[in-house]
């Protein structure tokens, strides 16, 4: 009987915690900003980081305030580029690195991330 009580208690606790987490809402000024935010979150970025990169705001409650469209700076674009590149290109190396990696994989992961950084920075310099 005690086992059932513990299970029911844990189930109720998880429902309450889930409700608390759902109450915060991300409000984005455009569909593009929403797509950037969602991609960032899917890639493992925190709510705060993804909101900063995309120009979205995290608000409590269920209603978004009227947002002015923020000016997206080159720095935010560069950070998003680096995050997306690292996630999509370097993911397999990083996954292997986290299992039973040797020094070769550590170096490969670092070089991959550096290449993403260089690529994104080079692109922004050329277009500026």
Swiss-Prot record:
**What are the subcellular locations of this protein?**
Secreted
What are the record's GO terms for cellular component? extracellular region
Main location per the UniProt record: secreted
Signal peptide position in this chain? 1-24
The record's annotation in InterPro entries points to:
Thionin (IPR001010), Thionin-like_sf (IPR036391)
- Which segments of the protein form a coiled coil according to its record? none
* Name this polypeptide is given: DELTA-urthionin-Uf1a
| Protein source organism | Urtica ferox (Tree nettle)
From which lineage does this chain's organism come? Eukaryota, Viridiplantae, Streptophyta, Embryophyta, Tracheophyta
